[in-house]
């Protein structure tokens, strides 16, 4: 039997998340008295590095060093709603929830500080 050789190309669509009921994830960000921040999640790190990715997302969005971010994934009773850690959704869904929460937290903190200092928040 003759061996045939050639070249080919393949394309695949790999969905991220399940899109069940919108596939939501939420994140809560708490400022501490030491100036650090705690990110509360109901997703868990299953060895894929989710806690590190989430901390990096928050640090970048808040404009803080990574050392000032603590990620808490231990308590689904106090953590926000999340569909779960499955289907390659951790970084995409949870990471984006953290970025949105961190941006909102930064905006609120800047507004409060600007009002207290009687300056424009953009300054």
Language-model segment annotations:
Residues 50-52, 80-85:
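Short acidic, glycine/serine/threonine-rich loops at helix termini
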Residues 18, 31-71, 89-119:
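Alpha-helical support elements that line or immediately flank enzyme active sites
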Residues 72-77:
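Short glycine-enriched loops at secondary-structure junctions
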Residues 7, 44, 83-84, 89:
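Flexible, active-site-adjacent loop/turn segments at secondary-structure boundaries
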Residues 2, 14, 86, 97-98:
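Generic hydrophobic, helix-prone segments enriched in Leu/Val/Ile
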Residues 1-36, 45:
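Helix-loop-helix junctions that connect adjacent transmembrane helices in secondary transporters/permeases
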């Amino acid at each position: 039997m003759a061996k045939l050789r050639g070249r080919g190309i393949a394309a695949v669509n790999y969905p991220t998340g399940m899109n069940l009921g919108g596939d939501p994830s939420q994140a809560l960000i708490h400022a501490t008295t030491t100036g650090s921040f705690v990110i509360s999640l109901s997703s868990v790190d299953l060895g894929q590095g989710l806690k590190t990715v989430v901390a990096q997302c928050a640090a970048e969005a808040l404009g803080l060093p990574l050392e000032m971010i603590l990620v808490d994934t231990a308590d689904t009773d106090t953590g926000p709603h999340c569909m779960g850690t499955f289907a390659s959704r951790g970084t995409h869904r949870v990471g984006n929830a953290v970025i949105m929460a961190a941006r909102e937290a930064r905006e609120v903190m800047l507004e409060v500080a600007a009002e207290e200092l009687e300056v424009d928040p953009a300054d």
